[in-house]
Amino acid sequence: MTQNTAIPMVDLRAHFAPLRDEILTGIGKILDDASFILGNQGRALEAEVAGLSGVAHGVGCASGTDALMLALRALEIGPGDEVIVPTFTFIATAEAVLYVGATPVFVDVDDRFYAMTIAGIEAAITPRTKAIIPVHLYGLPADMPGIMALAQKHGLRVIEDCAQAIGAQINGQGVGSFGDIGCFSFFPSKNLGAAGDGGMVVTADAELERKLRGLRNHGSWQTYHHDVLGYNSRLDEMQAVILRAEFPHLAAYNDGRRRAAGWYAEHLVGLDLQLPEAPAGYHHVFHQFTIQLNARDAVKTALHAEGIASAIYYPIPGHQQKMFAHQAQTHCPVAEHLAERVLSLPMFPELREEQIARIATVIRRTLHG
């Protein structure tokens, strides 16, 4: 490794440094007020995230995974039902389907935009299908207009997995507002990240909001009255105050990511690799900057030798995970090919062009041998 400073995948120290005093003041006030669960900070954040998405209601919860599970429960999806999910994404999407007793049906993805195709979804629909969960992978929205038209045609519910895409849009419409319910994650490395776990569900439907609020709180809509089996899944005030300190800067954070993506495109031009793309009208927020290349492993090794982080999202598609070995084998050739080619490079708003130039130099040197 050279004497150059290491470049991480995400620099949370740099991210939180300008907000430190504001966050500590907010945490001190929470300690003074001794209001830790379901308080004013959480309610304010719910309104802010719902407003960003363009819907009326937000319901905070303990994680993005819980957000998906709560959404499925609110839509009364359970044993005997099938839910269509992409195979090329984080396991939580399919995991949530299992948690409610339903069956995830894996669908292959497009190799340009990393999302399920309309044709692929339609081919997977059976009489048992109840919902579709499109994932806005890496910060790029899935084809929501097409998915919503297909869902309407077949009478299906739609849950958007927005974990990686807060602030992303299609023709000015925010993710989370297309489907019946949108689900967000506040894992620390996300575009809007907490100092721990957290999540949120958003919806335009007041009845779904009512269901979600009870389900996240032990199935209770009135203290000590428990109408259904629920969960202990609440976004605490400490995380909410941290997220609210960041929230006014989210657009700037996403702009910083898009700026870094532009620098990557400039410095990686002409190399034997595939850069991220976005359809016209799609606002990509670059949770990850993911390239495709045949020499993926060699490049990853070379970057590591120079103290530069990189990651493979994702090395094993969902349909090939051991936990689904009991299901009928699904063939998803695009996802299987992507798992051998994708490489995510450092991506965070504070990334500097000279850092990206250094990353590109290592990649160029490796590919040109």
From Swiss-Prot:
Its cofactor is pyridoxal 5'-phosphate. Keywords: Aminotransferase, Lipid A biosynthesis, Lipid biosynthesis, Lipid metabolism, Pyridoxal phosphate, Transferase. GO terms for cellular component: membrane. GO terms for biological process: lipid A biosynthetic process; polysaccharide biosynthetic process. Pathway: Bacterial outer membrane biogenesis; LPS lipid A biosynthesis. Its EC number is 2.6.1.122. The modification N6-(pyridoxal phosphate)lysine is found at K190. GO terms for molecular function: pyridoxal phosphate binding; transaminase activity. Coiled coil: none annotated. Signal peptide: none annotated. CDD domains: AHBA_syn. It catalyses: UDP-2-acetamido-3-amino-2,3-dideoxy-alpha-D-glucopyranose + 2-oxoglutarate = UDP-2-acetamido-3-dehydro-2-deoxy-alpha-D-glucopyranose + L-glutamate. SUPFAM superfamilies: PLP-dependent transferases. It comes from the Bacteria. Aminotranferase involved in the synthesis of 2,3-diamino-2,3-dideoxy-D-glucopyranose (GlcN3N), which is a component of lipid A in some species. Catalyzes the amination of UDP-2-acetamido-3-dehydro-2-deoxy-alpha-D-glucopyranose (UDP-3-oxo-GlcNAc) to UDP-2-acetamido-3-amino-2,3-dideoxy-alpha-D-glucopyranose (UDP-GlcNAc3N), using L-glutamate as the amine donor. Other amine donors, such as alanine and glutamine, can substitute for glutamate, but product formation is slower. Belongs to the DegT/DnrJ/EryC1 family. This is UDP-N-acetyl-3-dehydro-alpha-D-glucosamine 3-aminotranferase. The gene is gnnB.
